[in-house]
Amino acid sequence: MTTEIRNIKLVQKIASGAFGDIFIGQNTVTNQTVAVKLEKKAHYGQLKHEYGVYKALGGTRTPRIYEYGKILYENVYVNGLVMELMGKSLEQLFVTCSRRFSLKTVLMLGERMVDNVEYLHHRNYVHRDIKPDNFVFDVQGDRLYLIDYGLAKEFRNPMTFKHREMRTDKSLTGTARYASLRTHQGYEQSRRDDLESVGFCMVYFLKGRLPWQGLKAKTKQEKYDRIRESKESISLYELCMGLPKEIHSFCFYVRNLGYEDMPNYAYLRTLLSDALRQRGLRSDGVFDWMVRTPSDSMGDLEIL
């Protein structure tokens, strides 16, 4: 039986999405400020699933989870998840920086995104909705976290490590803009797909947009089809044109992984750290939004 959340007061709505709303809340006993995620009835059960994923992940690279249960909202009890309040998402920070990050910032973020995805994969889950909105810094702005596990799924048995069988009849799960090509083509998602989405995020941050943004369609399915066709027609070489060769190498490597292959996360991080070093830059944690002087110059770094 689901317990009632009694000591949390909802203070201010800060986000709203297809699955529910997120509030700033306050613990009326300790005065601690928290985040509270509420579930819309149409998606009943998704928040409980997300709570289970957070518990399975253990909390060292995810926000702390304080409580799950029923909470009174607008005179109705709904499912609620009380968790550590986070800072801004990468999408919010991207907007702050006029929708363009410097190469240094993107490479440092890439290293940290790979770290978070590797942590998730080692605990037998794939995220299936990797995008800038789902990477957030803590309130201090020191550490990057991957959040929103409502679509996360075990890709292998946690006891035997037997991989889930590949299916080729799946509908699109996640956000079409950042979904891997194979996700559009109906393949069951695995580790390679999360990492392809990381690659798309880096291209987005460096170029300001992806080629399949803004496509017009009459229906959602038609739009998905047009995005798929765009991803099929644009080679990775074309996608990464004008960017450091390491970004292309990253995207090419993950695109060519097999369904059950374990990615070489260390190799991917090395690609990004090498790109920094060749430019005479250090992964020092100083990002564009901290200094507010982002530079888009590629300098002498070899590009495609």
Swiss-Prot record:
Lineage top rank: taxon: Eukaryota
Active site (UniProt): 129 (proton acceptor)
Residues annotated for ATP binding in this entry: 14-22, 37
PANTHER family, per the entry: CASEIN KINASE-RELATED
Organism: Encephalitozoon cuniculi (strain GB-M1) (Microsporidian parasite)
SMART domains: S_TKc
A GO cellular-component term linked to this record: nucleus
Keyword terms, alphabetized: ATP-binding, DNA damage, DNA repair, Kinase, Nucleotide-binding, Nucleus, Serine/threonine-protein kinase, Transferase
Pfam families on file: Pkinase
EC number(s) on file: 2.7.11.1
Disulfide topology: none
SUPFAM superfamilies: Protein kinase-like (PK-like) (SSF56112)
Molecular-function annotations in GO: ATP binding; protein serine kinase activity; protein serine/threonine kinase activity
Domain Protein kinase: 8-304
Record-stated family: Belongs to the protein kinase superfamily. CK1 Ser/Thr protein kinase family. Casein kinase I subfamily.
Localization of this protein: Nucleus
Enzyme class: transferase
GO biological process: DNA repair
Protein name: Probable casein kinase I homolog ECU03_0910
